[in-house]
Amino acid sequence: MLNIFNLICIFFNSTLFSSTFLVAKLPEAYAFLNPIVDVMPVIPLFFLLLAFVWQAAVSFR
């Protein structure tokens, strides 16, 4: 339980500190990747939601 709590704290700390980097811009050569880079911080939340959906599918055994 403590390990899960630590991972959650690390995740929230990294998202808080990574928000300071939102003012940075990608180089022009990589400008087409801007939409993907904008979505990347949300990807770990998709895995969290996937875990709940998976457990609901197997009836929380």
UniProtKB/Swiss-Prot annotation:
Keyword Translocase carried by entry: no
InterPro entries per the UniProt record, alphabetical: PSII_PsbK, PSII_PsbK_sf
UniProt keyword list: Chloroplast, Membrane, Photosynthesis, Photosystem II, Plastid, Reaction center, Thylakoid, Transmembrane, Transmembrane helix
Cellular location(s): Plastid, Chloroplast thylakoid membrane
Transmembrane spans: 40-60
Cellular component terms per the entry's GO annotation: chloroplast thylakoid membrane; photosystem II reaction center
Protein's membrane topology: Single-pass membrane protein
Subunit and interaction comment: PSII is composed of 1 copy each of membrane proteins PsbA, PsbB, PsbC, PsbD, PsbE, PsbF, PsbH, PsbI, PsbJ, PsbK, PsbL, PsbM, PsbT, PsbX, PsbY, PsbZ, Psb30/Ycf12, at least 3 peripheral proteins of the oxygen-evolving complex and a large number of cofactors. It forms dimeric complexes.
PANTHER family associated with the record: PHOTOSYSTEM II REACTION CENTER PROTEIN K, PTHR35325
Protein name: Photosystem II reaction center protein K
Gene label: psbK
